[in-house]
Amino acid sequence: MGTLQEYDYLWFFLVIASIVPILAFTISEILAPIRSGPEKLTSYESGIEPKGQAWIQFHIRYYMFALVFVVFDVETVFLYPWAISFHSLGISAFIEALLFILILMVGLVYAWRKGALEWS
């Protein structure tokens, strides 16, 4: 089997992965009815009639907390496999994980000093 033939599966996957979303959006545009009106501009409250304005502004602090949460949630996802196979990885993996945690701690201290974690 030649080297180029090994990449045939990759090219096939990339072509299919490109065609499927385009096809899904195209079929949706063709088949979906286009209805506009005041009901389209209201928020959906699980079948309950919404009260008040549908368009409100959220305070930027919510986004800052969400951003910090996402960063440390992703950190957990990356560190879990490392912790599971800690004994078999060796010292280089330990140093890399330590460097990763150190970089994230620098980011946490930066966010803390900028006041991103204060709610006042």
UniProtKB/Swiss-Prot annotation:
Residues spanning the signal sequence: none
Domain of life: Eukaryota
UniProt KW Ubl conjugation keyword: no
One Gene Ontology molecular-function label: quinone binding
Gene3D superfamilies linked: NADH:ubiquinone/plastoquinone oxidoreductase, chain 3
Membrane-spanning ranges: 10-30, 64-84, 89-109
Membrane topology: Multi-pass membrane protein
Key words of the record: Chloroplast, Membrane, NAD, NADP, Plastid, Plastoquinone, Quinone, Thylakoid, Translocase, Transmembrane, Transmembrane helix, Transport
Family of this protein: Belongs to the complex I subunit 3 family.
Matches recorded under HAMAP family: NDH1_NuoA
Protein name: NAD(P)H-quinone oxidoreductase subunit 3, chloroplastic
Naturally occurring in which organism (per UniProt): Chara vulgaris
Gene encoding the protein: ndhC
